[in-house]
Design a protein with these regions (language model features):
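Conserved class I S-adenosyl-L-methionine
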Residues: 1-52
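Short catalytic micro-motifs in class I SAM-dependent methyltransferases
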Residues: 125-129
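A short glycine-rich, Lys/Arg-flanked "PGG" loop and its adjoining helix->strand segment in the class I
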Residues: 137-149
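Short alpha-helix
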Residues: 167-188
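A C-terminal cap/extension of S-adenosyl-L-methionine-dependent methyltransferases
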Residues: 174, 188-230
Length: 230
């Protein structure tokens, strides 16, 4: 079994097995998404990339398409957005939900795009699912290849191992630098530990921001890493 096969098998039917862990109606999950999107907007604004307009954007591991769909709120043109995912059913779900956006099934080790095709590449909780070092290096190399000089990689992934999901492993800041040595930019901690956030219930609005101020309780890294012009 290849690493890509292992990942696909691990994520087939994951939502059903997770027992509502990622329920979008959960207030903690809503707070997690809201915080990430606020941080993403700030990073793109500071980089001078908003409104997205005609910028070409690729999401590796696009899942059900929600993050690319959200970029429409940041001024992206749907025909400029592309998502790639291993699972055909996720690609089908995304294409149905966002018919104006291009979604493709494929392995990110071999992206079918020309060099420098994208101004922005998004990797949201992707590399934490790749255990094989060679595959991780291959995917990183492909991201670097299709990213234009001056473009950015939007990174968001876990910095701690998951106690509830054995198919996820931590990706430290040092590991990100190893995977993408040419890229420049800062990674900061974000996201209250999801198991804690999901248990806050009606206290979420007040408690989430307070608890998220405690650095060890922030489980993810986020950053916009730029590819030098030269």
């Amino acid at each position: 079994m290849t690493e890509a096969d292992r990942i696909a098998r691990a994520y087939e039917g994951l939502e059903e097995r997770a027992g509502g862990r990622w329920d979008p109606a959960n207030r903690g999950n809503q707070a997690i998404v809201r915080e990430r999107r606020v941080a993403t907007t700030r990073l793109l604004q500071e980089a001078g990339m908003l409104p997205l307009g005609t910028r070409e954007v690729l999401e590796v591991g696009s899942g059900a398409g929600g993050e690319l769909g959200w970029l429409l709120e940041l001024g992206a043109e749907p025909e400029r957005l592309t998502g790639v995912d291993l699972l055909e059913d996720r690609v089908a779900t995304a294409a149905k939900a966002y018919p104006g956006i291009r979604f493709r099934q494929g392995n990110a080790e071999k992206l079918e795009f020309a060099n420098g095709s994208f101004d922005l590449v998004m990797s949201i909780t992707v590399f934490s699912s790749i255990f094989d070092a060679r595959m991780a290096a291959n995917v990183a190399a492909e991201i670097l290849r299709v990213l234009r000089a001056g473009g950015g990689l939007l990174w968001y992934d876990v910095r701690y191992d998951s106690l509830s999901n054995r198919n996820v492993r931590a990706v430290t800041a040092a590991r990100v630098r190893e995977l993408f040595p040419p890229l420049r930019g800062e990674l900061t901690t974000v996201t209250l530990l999801p198991p804690l956030a999901r248990r806050l219930g009606p206290l979420t609005a007040g408690s989430y921001p307070l608890l998220a101020r405690v650095a060890p309780l922030r489980s993810h890294l986020i950053g916009l890493l730029r590819k030098p012009l030269h």
